[in-house]
Amino acid sequence: MSGKTIFITGASAGFGAACARMFASEDNKLILTARRIDPLLKLQEELSGRCEVQMIPLDVRDREAVQGAIEGLPERFRSIDILVNNAGLALGLEPAHRVDLDDWDTMVDTNIKGLMYCTRFVLPGMVARNSGHIINISSTAGAWPYPGGNVYGGTKAFVTQFSQNLRCDLLGTRVRVSCIQPGMAETEFSKVRFKGNEEAAAGVYQGTEPLTAEDIAETVRWIVSQPPHVNVNTLELMSIDQAWGPFAIHREQK
């Protein structure tokens, strides 16, 4: 995979940063976006000797900012070949009747609206060139319920369905759409979910060998390296230590 222009959201850490490192080569150009500037700057410095990097501090929840960032790209970066819609997060594990509504708003605005905005403003160029690939990062949480997953799971179910509907919209073009549904992966995800509580975050992975950010990046590499007539629609992957669980069951104590 070389000679491509790749736009990655949520590139400051986790899956996004791993994808940036994977795509970095002399012939690729990377557009890296994230809200957090310092880690984005460090990543740009790390990769600058390997490829051309355009760094954009960006909150994908801001529609006008997304539009301005994409339409304001330097000419040599405007023909985006691959969009990795990675920006997303989970906040809290409270049941629906006790949840902080601000957390719900943040998840909906980031996981759904942010992905929509980036797709909407990148896609016309792909359609005009009759070439491109959109990679949407969903989650097994969008397919399999668990207590406390309420809105987070709902947002990821949206990502999966939106990806499938995009495929229908783009039928007849050479623009591909793929959706990846990772299971448990050890990144900053749980630390963000538990709002900085590192002990709670570490407990999620205790005694397991979870997926890594690099596993997801390698999955992205495989998807985009398929022949142009092959579209990987939806790909679910889990650690060997994870499987589908039964429905939660409440049992009265005798």
Regions found by a protein language model. Give the residues of each.
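Substrate-binding pocket helix/loop in short-chain dehydrogenase/reductase
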Residues: E94-A96, D100-V108
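Residue(s) in the substrate-gating loop at a strand-loop-helix junction
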Residues: S139
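Conserved glycine-rich cofactor-binding loop
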Residues: S12-A13
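Conserved glycine-rich Rossmann-like NAD(P)H-binding loop of the short-chain dehydrogenase/reductase
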Residues: E26-K42
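The beta1-alpha1 cofactor-binding region of Rossmann-like NAD(H)/NADP(H)-dependent oxidoreductases
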Residues: P57-G68, L101
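Active-site helix of classical SDR
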Residues: T119, T155
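C-terminal helical subdomain
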Residues: C179-G183, E199-P246
